[in-house]
Every structure is written in structure tokens, then in C-alpha cells.
Amino acid sequence: MMDKRLVKISKTLSMLLRHHPEKLGLVLDQYGRTDWKTLVRRFNAHYQMHLDRQVLQAIMAQSTKKRFALEGTTIRAVYGHSVPVMPLTPATEPPQWLYHGTSHQAATVIAKEGLLPMNRDFVHLSEDVATARQVGARHDTHPVIYRIAARDAAKNGILFYPTSSRVWLVSELPARFLHHLTSYFRRP
């Protein structure tokens, strides 16, 4: 588990690289990458936190979710963007099943309209029920879990993009590929 300082830095980086690069005047390329040295210089000048390569490596090593990738002289958020970016990986055949955790309130809309990206570029799908439950529990104490017929959806022209953190991205998914599993209780 990360200490509070690293969590705060990680959340700030996520906000900048996923949603608001303009707060530091960062320019993201089409894949969401920005210059590492520029980010560090502006981050350290603007925030009351210290960021360097060692700090980022500690965040990456201690986090169960791989949120960031250092690629040569650039850094990017791996997924979760609300600013328009292209997936780094080509569309790939997904596993037979993927999963999505959500709130009961959202589930009523999802059952009719399918999965839509809402304020993001892509819908995020998990490779396992436990991760979907964890994601859904952020929005509802008893999240609704959907099992996605991913391979069937792919055969019907839906493109799936894998990430390095066992999250799959899809632009949207019609309701016919979703199977309501159940509501899960958050474990103590």
C-alpha cells in the first residue's frame, strides 16, 4: 500500500495526464504522452510536492493498478482519459468474458442503452470479477456486475483495446452483449 504522499502525487498526476493537462500547460500527443522533464519541472514548481523518476518508480511499483507508463523521454496515463487520446495498442481479440462494475443507478440506464463512455473516451472493462467489483464499489456499496460477452461482441465488429494493466477499452457496448451477474457486497 502506498503512503499518503505517494497517493497524493499519483492522484495529481492522474488528474493532469487524464483530464487537465492544461493546468500545467502540458501538451499531450495523440496517444496521451507528454515530455517527462517538462512535466517534472512544472509539477515541482506548481505543487507543494516533489516529483522525480524515483518517486514515479515508487508509485508504479507500489500501485496495484498500472496507471502510468514512462516511454523514453515521455510519460502517459495508461487509461482513464477524458481528453481525446488514441489507444497505444492495436485492437485485439478479447477474452471470452470481460466484466464491468457499476452502481445500481447507472445499471438501470446501462440495461437499456448499453455501456457508453460518458465523460471519457472509452468504457473500461476488467478481466476479472474481483476488479470489476472493486471499481463498482467506488460508486455503490453493493455494485452491480456485468459479464460482457466480449468475444461475441468482437465478432460483431466491436473493437477491444488491451492495456498493460488488465483493463480493456471499448468505445461502447450495446446492451445485448451484457449479462447482469449480481450485486456484490463490499468486503470489510
UniProtKB/Swiss-Prot annotation:
InterPro entries according to UniProt: Ptrans_KptA/Tpt1, RNA_2'-PTrans_C, RNA_2'-PTrans_KptA, RNA_2'-PTrans_N
GO MF annotation list: NAD+ poly-ADP-ribosyltransferase activity; tRNA 2'-phosphotransferase activity
One of the GO BP terms on file: tRNA splicing, via endonucleolytic cleavage and ligation
EC number of the protein: 2.7.1.-
Superkingdom of source: Bacteria
Record's keyword terms, sorted: NAD, Transferase
Functional note: Removes the 2'-phosphate from RNA via an intermediate in which the phosphate is ADP-ribosylated by NAD followed by a presumed transesterification to release the RNA and generate ADP-ribose 1''-2''-cyclic phosphate (APPR>P). May function as an ADP-ribosylase.
Family: Belongs to the KptA/TPT1 family.
Protein name according to UniProt: Probable RNA 2'-phosphotransferase
Originating organism: Lacticaseibacillus paracasei (strain ATCC 334 / BCRC 17002 / CCUG 31169 / CIP 107868 / KCTC 3260 / NRRL B-441) (Lactobacillus paracasei)
